[in-house]
Amino acid sequence: MSRRRKKLPQESITCEIESLSHEGRGVSHKDGKTLFVEGALPGETVTARYVNSRRSYDELAVEEVLTQHPQRIEPDCQFSKLCGGCSMQHVDLGFQINHKESVLLDHLRHFGDLKPEQVVPPLVGAGRGYRTKARLGVRYVAKRDEVLVGFRERYSNFLTAIDECPILIESVGGRIPELKALVRSLSGYQRIPQIEVAAGDDMCALVIRHMDPLTEEDLQKLIAFSEQTGLAIYLQPKGPDTVAKLWPKDGQELLSYQLRDYGLTMQFHPMDFTQVNRDINRRMLAQALEWLQPQAGETILDLFCGLGNFTLPIARSAAHVVGVEGSEDMVRRGYANAELNGISNVEFHAADLHLPLAPAKEAKHAWLRTYDKVLLDPPRSGAEELAKQMTRFGAKRIVYVSCNPATLARDAGILATQGYKLIKAGVMDMFPHTAHVESMALFEKA
């Protein structure tokens, strides 16, 4: 028998906000219970309504700000109070980045008992139109005979009824009503659950997931939309491996972005992982290479290398670079990008980097050898197994690019036991207006 959900208090309460949680929510207390208040800032007095209740804490959302923080601003997006895509549009970018830096340092201190010798200035960029990769939910609402396209509401599985998205690349974020109308015009409009957005430097693609076959009339409508907007249309009838380009019929399935500082063109499929913020990606690369300092005689290991975003820039300076990635498809993409750019001093391998490292003598693990330096860019789960055996590679310098400060701190603590010292750390604002923290850390062998 399922447990009956506790009924939420209906009356709003007044909260004195004491601090900000790592997730960017105001923290208060009432009757010995912690309150997390969405949309509230430290030092503010607000009225808030209950949206969720747990045994040890309650979640609330701001209704009215009675005493305002000096850095509170009017959100740039009219849908910010309802849409769950952003959580910090109510405060200026300076406050956001300072908060993210504090989160990073707190995690390093609490989880790794570490403090970097130097905290470097943050990498920051534009707060609008930065997002080149996103998954938009699609849902038909029968009561209103309307198709919604966008992100989920906060504290809900419903989609937010939006007409624009200022953080998305303009060619898509400014066309939400057109996307709604397009989906509604298709025969299977009730069976289209999502649209993937992926943009290169010169082309933006929409990958439309459709559960039912499309008619010839549907295809013509999609082609007409592509020609009117300049957006490429890809169709996905089943799993990711079924994605195929519908229009334009130019023989080019891949998108691309330029890394001009290194004379590189990086090609990728719309379903490949790429960094969502192209400007911050370029700044991140510059900082990573400055910290890594690849030299002409060195062999360097790039772990979780993806399609070669770090591998190929490093190869412009190093003698040899080895990229390792969990996906065979990404290994093939890495080799293809190397060939496209005339780079021959690289090799790519596929391996599950979350498992304990196998004996180096196994042929399929030929990449398990010594290196001068290591760069790693793991997913949110981090690189615990690699950190435990990092001395095996013999590297004197490690650059760790992180999308989760908690796992970075955990792995940094492990690296410290392996004899590596935390020299520098800093944040990168890859996702403005969210509490998401991207960071970079430099370790050197003590």
Curated annotation (Swiss-Prot):
Keyword rRNA processing among UniProt keywords: yes
Molecular function as annotated in GO: 4 iron, 4 sulfur cluster binding; iron ion binding; RNA binding; rRNA (uridine-C5-)-methyltransferase activity
InterPro entries reported for this sequence: 23S_rRNA_MeTrfase_RlmD (IPR001566), MeTrfase_TrmA_AS (IPR030390), MeTrfase_TrmA_CS (IPR030391), NA-bd_OB-fold (IPR012340), SAM-dependent_MTases_sf (IPR029063), TRAM_dom (IPR002792), U5_MeTrfase_fam (IPR010280)
PROSITE patterns, alphabetized: SAM_MT_RNA_M5U (PS51687), TRAM (PS50926), TRMA_1 (PS01230), TRMA_2 (PS01231)
Biological process according to GO: rRNA base methylation
Keywords, in A-Z order: 4Fe-4S, Iron, Iron-sulfur, Metal-binding, Methyltransferase, rRNA processing, S-adenosyl-L-methionine, Transferase
EC number(s) on file: 2.1.1.190
Binding locations of [4Fe-4S] cluster: 77, 83, 86, 165
Reaction(s) the record says it catalyses: uridine(1939) in 23S rRNA + S-adenosyl-L-methionine = 5-methyluridine(1939) in 23S rRNA + S-adenosyl-L-homocysteine + H(+)
EC top class, as a word: transferase
Binding site for S-adenosyl-L-methionine: 275, 304, 309, 325, 352, 377
Pfam families on file: TRAM (PF01938), tRNA_U5-meth_tr (PF05958)
Active-site residues (renumbered): 403
Domain TRAM: 6-64
Stated family: Belongs to the class I-like SAM-binding methyltransferase superfamily. RNA M5U methyltransferase family. RlmD subfamily.
Record-linked HAMAP family: 23SrRNA_methyltr_RlmD (MF_01010)
Function: Catalyzes the formation of 5-methyl-uridine at position 1939 (m5U1939) in 23S rRNA.
Protein name, per record: 23S rRNA (uracil(1939)-C(5))-methyltransferase RlmD
Gene: rlmD
